[in-house]
Curated annotation (Swiss-Prot):
GO CC, alphabetical: plasma membrane
NCBIfam families documented for this protein: A_tha_TIGR01569
Membrane topology qualifier: Multi-pass membrane protein
Organism listed in the record: Erythranthe guttata
Domain of life per record: Eukaryota
General function of this protein: Regulates membrane-cell wall junctions and localized cell wall deposition. Required for establishment of the Casparian strip membrane domain (CSD) and the subsequent formation of Casparian strips, a cell wall modification of the root endodermis that determines an apoplastic barrier between the intraorganismal apoplasm and the extraorganismal apoplasm and prevents lateral diffusion.
Keywords tagged on the record: Cell membrane, Cell wall biogenesis/degradation, Membrane, Transmembrane, Transmembrane helix
UniProt main location, coarse: membrane
Protein name per its UniProtKB record: Casparian strip membrane protein 2
SUBUNIT field: Homodimer and heterodimers.
Segments of this protein annotated with the region Disordered: 1-21
Subcellular location: Cell membrane
Family per record: Belongs to the Casparian strip membrane proteins (CASP) family.
Amino acid sequence: MEKSEATTIEIGETSRESKGKTPLLAEVEQTARTAGSYRRGVAIFDLILRVSAATSALAATITMGTTEQTLPFFTQFFQFQASYDDLPAFTFFVIALSIVTGYLVLSVPFSVVCIAQPLAAVPRLLLIVCDTLTVTLATAAASSSAAIVYLAHNGNADANWLAICQQFGDFCQRVSGGGGGVVRGGGSAHIHGGALRSRPEETLTDGVDVIHYWDRRWCEI
């Protein structure tokens, strides 16, 4: 007796499967589209703040780096002059803010990539890490400069530090303006760093998380 050939029977999708697949796929696409739109808006906001922070940092660097005042009177042996490079804290300020300005300018293309690819996680993570380091450097420079500016205005009798701002008024005004510029720039950097880390409550972290989420939901059905 010859063996009968195996017969393959194709079974179509059940009505339950056909009804459940399309809404889930549509919901995945809608969630991913919502997340992409939100993150594109955040990336545009980040780009604006990044350019603003770079402008403030550049202005603060130029202001501090060109600060110099010479009093109109002098003696046979002394000339009364004040410059930013007379104080190491101000020199550190200029170097640190130059680094911050260069970083902010170089980070603009990465911010543009975040606008073009809003669900890309690597550029956003790189910007967050570098922004944190940049804010730390700018804060250190501003703090050290603020301490010297305070001593220049008020002096310190215990350290025999005389208040020089009564004589070098223009010098103190310029270094104070430079410190104010880095505070504004650091504030902008902190804001756009927080914007990159934020997300809406109704969306997931990125497109991969969206797919994994709906894969789990699909397995539970």
